[in-house]
Amino acid sequence: MMPVRPAESSQCTLNYVAPRWLPGGQLQTIWPALYSRRVKGPAWTTPDADFLDVDYLQDGAPTEFLRPLLVVFHGLEGSSRSHYGEAFADVARERGWACALPHFRGCSGEINRAPRAYHSGDHEEMGWMLERLRRAHRGPLMAVGVSLGGNALLRWAAEAGAQAGRSVDAV
């Protein structure tokens, strides 16, 4: 395993200003849960003959996209219907990006066939998902994870080391 190097840091000089019609943290948290758009997508067959569901923003598959693709990994017991997943999808839409929201096993609403569950250290399956997305997408690919999804993504990046750049352009 390669040693983890600290990322270059830069000071953010922008201050967040909430829209007048959406003041306060509570309303900003509730808004995406109430008004975000839903996405749908196909199931992928895994190497162990199970399946993973991946939801895409708009067109159903990223193959024709040259624009950036944002991949959002959900938290514990989350899904593409989690308010934060829909909020990320809305941001991607506003920026003209594609967005993919893969479900970890058992989180898409359907019971999986294989007796395998997801966990925060499952970096192999995370790598498989990212490699499959990279093969299908020609544009820049960025990955983000929320809570457990962030932990699994960073574990994958640490395990992959310099090879991570073959699958993603940014984590």
What kind of region is each of these model predictions?
Residues 46-50, 81, 119-123:
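Phosphate/oxyanion-binding active-site loops and adjacent basic polyanion-contact surfaces
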Residues 129-171:
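Primarily recognizes the serine-hydrolase "nucleophile elbow" in alpha/beta-hydrolase
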Residues 54, 70-71, 99, 126, ...:
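Structural signal for hydrophobic/aromatic residues that build the beta-strand cores
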Residues 77-80, 118, 144-145:
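Short amphipathic alpha-helical molecular recognition features
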Residues 24-63:
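N-terminal cap/lid segment of alpha/beta-hydrolase-fold proteins
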Residues 1-36:
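N-terminal presequences and immediately downstream first alpha-helices
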